[in-house]
Amino acid sequence: MPVERMRMRPWLEEQINSNTIPGLKWLNKEKKIFQIPWMHAARHGWDVEKDAPLFRNWAIHTGKHQPGIDKPDPKTWKANFRCAMNSLPDIEEVKDRSIKKGNNAFRVYRMLPLSERPSKKGKKPKTEKEERVKHIKQEPVESSLGLSNGVSDLSPEYAVLASTIKTEVDSTVNIIVVGQSHLDSNIEDQEIVTNPPDICQVVEVTTESDDQPVSMSELYPLQISPVSSYAESETTDSVPSDEEGAEGRPHWRKRNFEGKQFLSNMGTRSTYLLPSMATFVTSNKPDLQVTIKEESCPMPYNSSWPPFTDLSLPAPVTPTPSSSRPDRETRASVIKKTSDITQSRVKSC
């Protein structure tokens, strides 16, 4: 709990009336004007008992200094006393009568009556504050009420219809229709659109026709592939016809190989189109075809394969200068044979 003590103004009046402090006196007791000795501690002839007893008494009164225990500190006493005097609202300094320099420096103060006391700084009457707060609070409330129904400039007649508003929800737009229960038939129905529809952006994709020439420097345009014929056949014609079945069946033929007869279907198969390639090629490009060639020497299916050692693979021909030598040798042998034949004919004759 804080120590109860006398306030500064009555305590100061008591110190002045005691006449125990030299230099502290009334200049005009009726107007409550008094002076306080204010000599600087650095001045020659300054004395604690003569120039600082008032400041020491205030430090003792406030509990900042205890005689015999604390070390004397006149500068701190004077600073605390000056701060306390400046904080009082009912005491002001008479600066035109004060002398702050010299050995006889002093300050003159005046105690103000209740009628002249100014109001505390930073505080305003409660009435003004309350009016401001009410004014600020009412503005947003009124604005929200005006905009809640969608239209702010409606006549008082429409205010009655606030309870009769019915909401109809469409598939795309929410529309509020005001009823006609309390108005005459002359007033037309009003529709207030609360949620307008969103604006959609339409994007068109165009493709170039096949007839237009396309340069190699340009990028390929967006092309839509035609429907696959294979897919159409799967969806439309699920059951093949007799002709298609006949075309798809292999034709077996009898063949002889090394005195053995066997059936072979080689060479009878027709060419087929890849069913799924129709979706990847356009009309101006040839379709990709797959053909099956007939083997030159087919083998029967029931015969065994010859050993790999008997198979002689032709050696790869490398273009070297020595490749022309066999041709020269064969030519020389032919010439030699012809010469031998001619000689034999000559001898026989």
UniProtKB/Swiss-Prot annotation:
Residues 228-254, 301-349 are annotated as: Disordered. InterPro entries: Interferon_reg_fac_CS, Interferon_reg_fact_DNA-bd_dom, IRF1/IRF2, WH-like_DNA-bd_sf, WH_DNA-bd_sf. It is found in: Nucleus. SUPFAM superfamilies: Winged helix' DNA-binding domain. Specifically binds to the upstream regulatory region of type I IFN and IFN-inducible MHC class I genes (the interferon consensus sequence (ICS)) and represses those genes. Also acts as an activator for several genes including H4 and IL7. Constitutively binds to the ISRE promoter to activate IL7. Involved in cell cycle regulation through binding the site II (HiNF-M) promoter region of H4 and activating transcription during cell growth. Antagonizes IRF1 transcriptional activation. Belongs to the IRF family. This is Interferon regulatory factor 2. It comes from Sigmodon hispidus (Hispid cotton rat).
